[in-house]
Regions:
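A hydrolase-biased, glycine/serine/histidine/acidic-enriched motif that marks catalytic-domain neighborhoods
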Residues: 1-281
Length: 281
C-alpha cells in the first residue's frame, strides 16, 4: 500500500468532437477492511480510476476523529494527485460514507470540483432512529493469509466505531454565514429546504438484502441503520440537503456484488452512473 492513491484503471483518452477533454477521474475509497482489492475486479469505467487504501492498515495507528480525520487525509491525497479540475468520488460500504465527508471538505476548494458521489451499498446511519444490524463490507479474498486477516480485522473493528460516532456533514449554501449561532443565507428564504446543496449522488443498492446465515460474524462489523434499512434509499432520504439523484439496483447482496457472477453488471452500471454525473447540461 505504498502507492496511495493507486491507479487502478488508466484510460487512454483520445480527443473527439463529443469529448474534448479527458473524462473526470474517479477516486474510490477503501471498504471496511481498509483495502481497495475489490475495485481491481471492475471492468472498464471509461476514465482513470484511483483507489485510496487505509494508510493505517497493518499499523497501531488510529484516526483521532474517525471518519472526519480520515477524510481530511484523503482529501489531501486527492489534491496531490489531481490538484485542479473535476473529479468523482465514491466507495463501497464504509467508503461511500467517507466519500461524502471528503466531498464536503472539498466543497470549499476553488480549484478542485467534485461533480458527483457514487455510493456502493452504503447505508446512512440515521441518528435517533430504530436500528437493526447491518454489516460493513470487505473482500475476504484480499485477507486469506493469517497476517492479512488480523490486519483486516483491526480495520473493521475501527470502522465499526467510526460509523457509530460519525456525524454526517451539514450541507450549506456557500454564502451562508453563521452569526450568533444562527445561519443567514443571502438571497434565500430561511424556510427554503428544497434546494439540494451537495454534489449530486447516485446510490447502488444490492438487491438481495438478506445476510448469509453461514457468514462468520468475525468477517464483518456491525453498523446502525433504521428498521427500514432495506428501503430503496438505505436511509439517505433522511439526509437533509443531500442531493441523491438516483438509486440503482445491482445483483447480489452486500458481500457478493463484486463476485464473478455480479461484477460485470456492477461495472456497466457504474460506468453509466459516472457518465450521468459528469454529463454537461
Amino acid at each position: 500500500m505504498n502507492q496511495n492513491p493507486i491507479l487502478i484503471q488508466r484510460h487512454h483518452y483520445r480527443k473527439t468532437f463529443a469529448q474534448k477533454t479527458p473524462p473526470e477521474p474517479l477516486f474510490l475509497i477503501h471498504d471496511g477492511g481498509g483495502t481497495v482489492f475489490s475495485y481491481f475486479l471492475l471492468g472498464s469505467l471509461g476514465r482513470n480510476v484511483y483507489g485510496i487504501s487505509n494508510p493505517h492498515f497493518g499499523t497501531d495507528l488510529t484516526w483521532t476523529n474517525g471518519i472526519a480525520s480520515m477524510a481530511e487525509c484523503y482529501a489531501k491525497l486527492i489534491k496531490e494527485t489531481c490538484p485542479f479540475g473535476d473529479i468523482l468520488l465514491g466507495g463501497w460500504s464504509l467508503g461511500g460514507l467517507v466519500a461524502v465527508q471528503i466531498a464536503q471538505i472539498l466543497s470549499g476548494d476553488s480549484e478542485l470540483n467534485v461533480t458527483g458521489i457514487i455510493m456502493i451499498d452504503s447505508t446512512f446511519p440515521a441518528e435517533g432512529q430504530p436500528i437493526k444490524t447491518r454489516r460493513i463490507a470487505f473482500n475476504a479474498e484480499a485477507s486469506t493469509r493469517p497476517e492479512m486477516t488480523e490486519k483486516t480485522r483491526k480495520c473493521m473493528n475501527e470502522a465499526q466505531l467510526q460509523i457509530r460516532q460519525w456525524t454526517p456533514p451539514v450541507w450549506r449554501f456557500p454564502m451562508a454565514e453563521v452569526q450568533d449561532g444562527q445561519s443567514h443565507m443571502a438571497g434565500l428564504k430561511m424556510n427554503d429546504t428544497t434546494t439540494p446543496l451537495s454534489p449530486p449522488a447516485i446510490l447502488f443498492r444490492a438487491t438481495d438484502n438478506s445476510l448469509d446465515s453461514n457468514t462468520d460474524v468475525s468477517e464483518a462489523s456491525d453498523t446502525k441503520v433504521s428498521n427500514d434499512g432495506g428501503s430503496q434509499a438505505l436511509g439517505f432520504d433522511r439526509y437533509e440537503n443531500f442531493d441523491l439523484r438516483e438509486v440503482v439496483d445491482t445483483s447480489g447482496d452486500h458481500f457478493s456484488i463484486f463476485s464473478n457472477d455480479n461484477v460485470n453488471e456492477l461495472s456497466k452500471k457504474l460506468k453509466d452512473a459516472c457518465d450521468k454525473l459528469t454529463k454537461k447540461s
